[in-house]
Amino acid sequence: MELVIGLLVILLALFAAGYFFRKKIYTEIDRLESWKIEILNRSIVEEMSKIKHLKMTGETEEFFERWREEWDEIVTAHLPKVEELLYDAEENADKYRFKKANQVLVHIDDLLTAAESNIEGILREISDLVTSEEKSRGEIEQVRERYSKARKNLLAYSHLYGELYNSLETDLDEIWSGIKEFEEETESGNYIKARKVLLEQDRRLDQLQTYIDDVPKLLADCKQTVPNQIAKLKDGYREMTEKGYKLEHIQIEKELDTLTNQVKRAENALLEELDVDEASAILQLIDETIQSMYEQLEGEVEAGQSVLSKMPELIIAYEKLEEEKDRTKTETELVKESYQLTAGEIGRQHAFEKQLETIGRLLEQAREKLDGEHVAYSLLIEEVEAIEKQLEEAQKEHAEYRENLQALRKEELQARETLMHLRKTISDTARMLQKSNVPGIPEQVKDKLETANHHIEETVSQLEELPLNMEEAAKHLDEAEKVVEEVSEEAEDLVIQVKLIERIIQYGNRFRSQNHILSEQLKEAERLFYAYSYNEAYEMAADAVEKAAPGAVKKIKADQSAS
């Protein structure tokens, strides 16, 4: 029983597979059949009828015959063959010869693809032929008009073209021959070939029109404009040389000879080769070179004006600075009698004198070159501007040095004024301590007071010396200011602290009779207080009172700050 069921299952599976493959093949057969019918229904004959208005000779006749033969072959040979193969594929599918059926279908697809490609090629060639005829029919009149216009212009302005007239006329004759060739090919039915001939004449007319438009100007440039520019530049060069300008470094005469040869090259490119682009490029380069030469000459003139105006000014400024140097040197010697100058200040004076010597030497060299015959202004201006910069730096350095000399007296007066202020601060601090009834001054404060007085006395001593060493005096003065500021602040803090200790002890006295421990602590605080150990006295008193009345110390501080 199980064997029977197994066989039935296998049979059903085989039947299902066979059904699936047959259906797939039938679907492909239907697709190929539809494609075949679509090809058969293509309007090739209708498309071919579009050329009936053309002359059926030459290329057109050859094309038409070939297209008709190819279409007949598709209809009478390829498509019947496809029909036969479709029947074979269907028969193979019915007999479950699926592999054979698929091979036949692939072959059919190849045949239909080839037929489709062949048809597309025919349609494309038909379109090209018809389009060529239509475009040429529309463009030939434009070409004739352009030809006529070019010939009229050439005849009307023949005198502008000189030796090129015959060459340009020959080109026009060749274009006319090309137009005639176009007409002959069109009459012979060779529309595609005629199209190529027409496009070539159109291109040649474009080129010829460029020649007609550009050649007169280029010839005028070669024969008149550029030679005149070269002559004018040569005259300007000669005139500047006669006025004393040194222009050997520019080498204009040699360059102008080269430009003259370049003009001949441009003219030859036009007359012998009819190469407008080459001639234009050469003339453009010549124009750029001429402009560059003018810029160099103008630069030489500007440099000359600048040199001739700056040199007298620099000489005057140098001589004035020399006079100031002598006065400053005398002033420096006078200052040295009263003040000790630092090594840096003395070095600045020596450096300034050397710098001035260098500037004088450079000025003399520049003056010699200016009086000579072989140095161009454009080269000399760089040296003059460098001297000008050095002179400005020397003037600035000298002014700063003079200011430093004058500042020494100001620094001395400022130092003496500061000393008076420091002495007053110390005196005020001592008076404040005395009025505050402080039991005594701690050793730390005494030491700082002594240190401050020491630096003050050292500063006074330095200020009394001749020559005065202001740098050393300033060091002692800075130390004195620092120490006086510290001791003044500490003295103020000391007075505040003493008053606070007294208030805390007074506040704690109310608890003495009731609290023996507090009484002993306050007694110790008083001992420390009169021993000038104010920090320890504060800690002892504050600790005792805070234990007896928490928060009392904070309140006492607040009351003291408010009073």
UniProtKB/Swiss-Prot annotation:
Cytoplasmic compartment segments: 22-563
Its membrane topology: Single-pass membrane protein
GO cellular component: plasma membrane; septin ring
Coiled-coil positions: 133-159, 243-276, 309-529
Subcellular location: Cell membrane
Regions crossing the membrane: 3-21
Xref: InterPro entries: EzrA
A Pfam entry, by short name: EzrA
Topological domains annotated Extracellular: 1-2
Primary location: membrane
Domain of life: Bacteria
GO biological process per UniProt: division septum assembly; septin ring assembly
Keyword entries, A-Z: Cell cycle, Cell division, Cell membrane, Coiled coil, Membrane, Septation, Transmembrane, Transmembrane helix
HAMAP family named among the record's database cross-references: EzrA
UniProt function note: Negative regulator of FtsZ ring formation; modulates the frequency and position of FtsZ ring formation. Inhibits FtsZ ring formation at polar sites. Interacts either with FtsZ or with one of its binding partners to promote depolymerization.
Family: Belongs to the EzrA family.
Name the UniProt record assigns to this protein: Septation ring formation regulator EzrA
Species the sequence originates in: Bacillus velezensis (strain DSM 23117 / BGSC 10A6 / LMG 26770 / FZB42)
